[in-house]
Amino acid sequence: MNSFLRKMLLCCIAIMGLNATQAQEDMKLLVGADFDMYFDNREYVDCKFGESQTLFSSRLTPKVGVEWNKYNRLVAAMDLWADHGNNTVVLAKARPQFYYEFDSKKVAAYAGIFPREKMMGDYTDIMVSDSMRFYDNRVQGVMGQYKGDRGFAEISADWCGMYSEASREKFRIMSAGRYYIDNYHRRFYAGYNFSMFHFAGSKLIHDCVNDQLMLDPYVGVRFNAFLDFDVKLHYIQTFQRDRDNDENYRQPKGGMLQLRMAKWGVYIDEQLYLGENLQPYYRSYRSEAFPNGYGGELYGGESFFGTTEHIYNITKVGYDRWFFGNTMRVNCYFAMQYDGTGWGNKQIVSVSVRLLKDIALSKKK
């Protein structure tokens, strides 16, 4: 028996050694850098539900990693931030990224602290605003994705706040999916976006605990008539509760129509929301901890969806295109916005660069 066990052990060690050798033979060194610049000028003097301000920042993310067996990666990176016009601080902040990535034709998985842009879901401005995508660009947790011939599905868990004296405990679960009803032309589709956000206390703040769920099923159609058209109809249902002020969940809801027309990178994007105030705690239920309401700490979407006038309309005219072998992207647009009380506008300019080089670590025989 002991001889048999020794032989089995030696066999397992040999197999593991062979696999390790094969993995090392396929190993590559990854070296790269990401760059993002974001300019966001908002003119909301006549609007009740938006604040006039200018956001202007840049982010450089050098990164290094290893790849093995074609599908596996370990990556370490550092986000280096600078706010334009702030000459008193060299770097506004520096935040790490460390993550494992598995990416095959059908399945992808991530664990650690990884870029939000790895998400495939079409999360609208209701859940994630343009500024949140830039300034909160990391997911701290795990994510799984399935990529099929007729659509995709994904789910992620983001532990975005640690329980301590300096921060509140916060975590967000997001999921999205899309299914193309006609597989040949891929014109008609249906999908959903989902977000569950738990906004808890800290060691210094024991109240103001919020639970928030948002569900956004939609149907859409894509077609070409000289221009590329994409039309989507959404139904938004939310469940929200401030535990200190409400015994039951508030359930604001609404509908949204999206129409996009594009050609040669130039696009017009029309978005019309009709419904209830989707952000009931944004300005209300003031407390000592949040004298002006919970604001953007609780809501990641555009503040205009907190309108009490049952309407929000935004029209974007812009240009969005990749250059130089899909290594540099320019996205800029001018937007007119109406919240039921007045008109406002904003101008967005974003520039992104994605560079990545892989270097084989094994010598070819």
Where are these regions (language model features)?
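Sec-dependent N-terminal signal peptides
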Residues: 4-17
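Exposed, low-structure sequence patches enriched in small/polar residues
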Residues: 36, 97, 148-156, 160, ...
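Surface-exposed coil loops of outer-membrane beta-barrel proteins
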Residues: 44, 108-178, 198
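A generic structural signal for short coil/turn motifs at secondary-structure boundaries
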Residues: 11, 50, 84-87, 162-165, ...
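A short acidic, glycine-rich active-site loop
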Residues: 70, 131-135, 302-304
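A short acidic (Asp/Glu
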Residues: 86-89, 121-123, 203, 243-246
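Beta-barrel outer-membrane channel/assembly domains of diderm bacteria
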Residues: 2, 22-103, 260, 345-364
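Residues that act as N-cap/strand-start positions at coil-to-secondary-structure junctions
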Residues: 58, 94, 136-138, 213, ...
